[in-house]
Amino acid sequence: MSKQPENSFSSDKFFPIKQKLALEAVALVEPGMCVGLGSGSTAREFILALGDRVRTERLVITAVASSRISQLLAEAVGIPLSDHSLLQDVDLVVDGADEVDPCLRMIKGGGGALFREKILLQSGKRNVILVDERKLVPTLGKFSLPIEIAPFGCSSVQRILNKQGYFGEWRETSAGERFITDNGNYIYDVRTPDSYANPEEDMIRLLQIRGIIDVGFVIAKAEVWVGYADGSIVRKKEHNEY
């Protein structure tokens, strides 16, 4: 069983880079915007920075959170949230990613919120993905590929995945219990294969399996902002070798 990733935040040596990325991104927010809030450690810093602007500048916005954790944090820092069931166009979505390849294709879902994160990205007029340099990979698959799977018939879905060559583990909480997403589903973390040269093909193949809700591949129009250890930030908008 794979364990749900733990939050390290300030113990991460790249924490200052994440904060800098968040501050750069929060400057994009303008009055009246609807802002999509991602999940994960870098998105957390963005939410904190946005909450600070709401408090100190009396910035009038609305926001939609991609996870229960992000929702609770947004509420705690005073960011007004809109009804996610009424979600339509989102002016700006800010999120992170687990891996990014040279074509800006990504893997998301390390925090277990991949389905909602992808809905936000689909709705975003402008999508900004914040990552540090460790997330840049030549080919996707360095870590694992999260797949969200409905509980009903999940063992059958796993059998089909294995038959097609996708092997992994069901994600667990730190208490050793099956991890459950905000949508009430499970996460199967695929370890093998460990590289995806053509993730579009794998995504199509996987989404044809009944019971799979979504796959961690993100192939969408987005800007990727990369923070480096030397303090620099590089903004990528299209195919661009590292």
UniProtKB/Swiss-Prot annotation:
Any Pfam family: Rib_5-P_isom_A
- Cross-referenced InterPro entries, in alphabetical order? NagB/RpiA_transferase-like (IPR037171), Ribose-5P_isomerase (IPR050262), Ribose5P_isomerase_typA_subgr (IPR020672), Ribose5P_isomerase_type_A (IPR004788)
Q: In which pathway does it act?
A: Carbohydrate degradation; pentose phosphate pathway; D-ribose 5-phosphate from D-ribulose 5-phosphate (non-oxidative stage): step 1/1
Q: Locate the residues binding substrate.
A: S39, G40, S41, T42, D95, G96, A97, D98, K108, G109, G110, G111, K135
Q: What is its EC number?
A: 5.3.1.6
GO molecular function, one example? Answer: ribose-5-phosphate isomerase activity
Q: Recite the UniProt keywords alphabetically.
A: Isomerase
Would I find Isomerase among this entry's keywords? Answer: yes
Q: Which residues form a coiled coil?
A: none
Q: Which domain of life is it from?
A: Bacteria
* Presence of keyword Isomerase: yes
Chemical reaction(s) catalysed: aldehydo-D-ribose 5-phosphate = D-ribulose 5-phosphate
Which GO annotations describe the biological process of this protein? pentose-phosphate shunt, non-oxidative branch
Catalytic residue positions: E117 (proton acceptor)
Q: How does it assemble?
A: Homodimer.
Function noted in UniProt: Catalyzes the reversible conversion of ribose-5-phosphate to ribulose 5-phosphate.
Please report which protein family the annotation says this sequence is part of.
Belongs to the ribose 5-phosphate isomerase family.
The record's listing under PANTHER family reads: RIBOSE-5-PHOSPHATE ISOMERASE 3, CHLOROPLASTIC-RELATED (PTHR43748:SF3)
Name the chain's protein. Answer: Ribose-5-phosphate isomerase A
Name the gene for this chain: rpiA
